[in-house]
Regions:
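Histidine-centered, transition-metal-coordinating active-site segments
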Residues: 1-139, 148-600
């Protein structure tokens, strides 16, 4: 073993872990220190699918088992790509990797030992290249989600928007610089690098830390670091492959029926003019089509199930609302001493939310929010002061507290299910048909949606242009225009308008609204590609599936609207109740400032 470990201190023996998806996952001995670290063990308590168990009770998996599965598939994918390429390609790739690592300004002792030598061929890494890269790729697969906050993607926006209050101005500046330089805006990727850099050296006693860091962090294009990173996060990646199979098994659906062996064993390493790529060979087209279809169906029926969407939305609003109320000025018009005492109580239970700097410690201590359980404990501890504020003499405090208590009922314990204006494509069209004048006015005011820029081929763009003239697509375009950009700012503004102007729905009484866009899950031509020899082609050039899936995405509802009653709603929402909510939504939104262009 090359590195800092002594010859009489070899790495631990490999360990085999039982897994419901892959049967057995092999953990290389060199990764045992990393697996046992506090940062990776924290993932045992970070849910994979947030509150999707609202509708799928057994969908209770955590990021830890997904990290092990991704590690397992990453090694298999790398080994396949290395095995299937020609000797001269292997030689050029290994030479470039070792040369670049040797030229790095700083290297940890283990990496430095691997690349030491007068010439590239003299380095200990040269004959062990495939194994060393396999270990590095395995480590990246294991660590790829280590930066997720409690409840994963659902609370990423909360942490990013309040990073100064939660982590300080320096962290905010560093995160902004990372996003600008890398082109990656995902908060958890920045957080993962922060956690990686604070992991103790003991975790990397038998691993080339600097090499792992290069692969984990680089998103620069087609060089070898991005090429290796793409095994975990790329056009076809083992991250997506593992979570589709794992989530499907837990949810009890058939949507994980994917020939993963065919896919992984079809990975190929190619040299391109600007660098290197790892992608799927054409022999995997049928398996790739199945993967894309199952992915689209998984999002449609599981991730974007209206009950799961509203539970996640309620968790986000509840967390944001409690934190913002606790941080608000102590004096509010109409408040009294009891209100100030309740606000003080609310502030006193807010934990240290900086999970990034506590992730590497097992002994983070009381009052630190590192995972899902900590966050739920905080929300539950907030109920007592919120209940006191719900009787406040201040209309503002009383209204905010009442909404937060109802949101907590939705997202924790599932004591309340808001009423959706529509639950599926059929009901979406029904609501449009029931409100033809309003829908026609909304569509008329909105520009015709543009053909998605990610469709490269002329056939795809022409077909998409025809789809965009259909009613569901036109209505989606109108609502997309009203609800604004990817930050969901427009959705929040419309939500506030609806709650202020339409606080009552027949049959449900008084309440408030939640509006939640659901992302456009496209099959992008530049990412869905296959290799035929040395030629890379868009999948849409050899398969009709990308266009068919784009059609589904263009036509399906792009948002959900919910009414949250303050009273007790019917146990089961019938069609008439949902119709009443849908009618109220369309009539109110037609008069909103976003629709009319008038100032609020």
């Amino acid at each position: 073993m090359v590195g800092t470990a002594a010859a009489d201190d070899p790495p631990p023996r490999r360990r085999v872990v039982r897994d419901p998806v892959h049967d057995y996952v092999e953990v290389p001995g060199e990764l045992e220190g990393l697996v046992a670290s506090a940062a990776v063990q924290r993932l045992r308590n970070i849910s994979q699918n947030a509150r999707a168990n609202r509708r799928y009770p057994s969908l209770t998996g955590f990021r830890y088992e997904h990290a092990l599965g991704t590690m397992h598939l990453a090694v298999a994918g790398w080994e396949s790509a290395w095995r299937t390429c020609e000797d001269d390609v292997r030689s050029r790739f290994a030479r470039e990797v070792i040369s670049d690592v040797r030229a790095a300004p700083e290297l940890d002792p283990c990496t430095a030992a691997w690349v030491s030598g007068k010439e590239v061929e003299d380095t200990p890494m040269w004959p062990e290249f495939a194994r060393v890269i396999g270990l590095a790729v395995a480590a990246v697969g294991l660590l790829h989600d280590v930066g997720h906050p409690p409840f994963s993607h659902v609370l990423e926006r909360f942490y990013q928007e309040r990073i100064v209050a939660v982590m300080g101005a320096d962290a905010a500046l560093d995160q902004a610089e990372y996003a600008a330089l890398s082109g990656q805006a995902q908060f958890h990727e920045w957080a993962g690098l922060q956690i990686f850099d604070t992991l103790p050296d003991e975790c990397f006693r038998h691993l080339p830390r600097s090499l792992v860091r290069l692969i984990l962090s680089d998103r620069s294009g087609d060089d070898w670091t991005d090429c290796l990173h793409s095994v975990i996060d790329g056009q076809f990646d083992v991250d997506r492959l593992d979570y589709l199979m794992r989530d499907s098994r837990r949810a009890g659906t058939e949507l994980g029926s994917i020939d993963w062996r065919r896919l992984v064993h079809s990975l190929e390493l190619h040299q391109v003019p600007d660098g290197w790529r790892i992608g799927l060979g054409a022999r995997a087209i049928s398996a790739f089509e199945t993967l894309l279809v199952q992915r689209a169906q998984h999002y449609r029926w599981v991730i974007h199930h209206p009950a799961a969407v509203v539970a996640d939305a309620a968790l986000t609003r509840c967390t944001e609302g409690i934190f913002d109320l606790a941080c608000s000025p102590p004096h509010t018009e109409g408040s009294d001493g009891a209100d100030r005492a309740a606000l003080a109580d609310l502030r006193s239970v807010v934990p240290d939310l900086d999970y990034v700097h506590s992730a590497v410690r097992f002994d983070a201590g009381v009052g630190v929010c590192r995972d899902d359980a900590d966050l739920l404990a905080w929300l539950r501890a907030s109920r007592r002061p919120l209940t006191a504020l719900a009787d406040s003499g201040s209309p503002e405090l009383r209204g905010r507290a009442r909404r937060l208590l109802r949101l907590h009922d939705v997202c924790d314990g599932f004591a309340l299910e808001p009423v959706a204006a529509w639950r599926n494509y059929h009901e979406y069209l029904e609501r449009a048909a029931q409100n033809p004048d309003v829908v026609a006015a909304l569509i008329e005011q909105a520009p015709l949606a543009k053909t998605p820029s990610f469709l490269v081929s002329a056939a795809s763009r022409e077909a998409a242009a025809l789809m965009l003239t259909e009613l569901p697509a036109r209505l989606n375009g109108a609502l997309d225009e009203l609800l604004g950009d990817d930050d969901h700012v427009g959705a929040r503004e419309v939500e506030a308008w609806l709650s202020a102007t339409t606080p009552h729905v027949d049959g449900l009484g008084e309440g408030f609204w939640l509006i939640q866009p659901v992302g456009f899950l496209a099959v992008r031509d530049e990412f869905a590609t296959v290799w035929r020899g040395d030629m890379e082609s868009p999948l849409s050039a050899v398969s009709p599936f990308p266009l068919a899936l784009t059609a589904i995405e263009v036509m399906r509802p792009h948002c959900y609207a919910y009414f949250v009653p303050f009273g007790t709603p019917p146990l089961h929402h019938d069609k008439e109740t949902r119709r009443a909510v849908g009618d109220a939504f369309f009539h109110a939104i037609a008069d909103s400032p976003a629709a009319t262009g008038d100032p609020a």
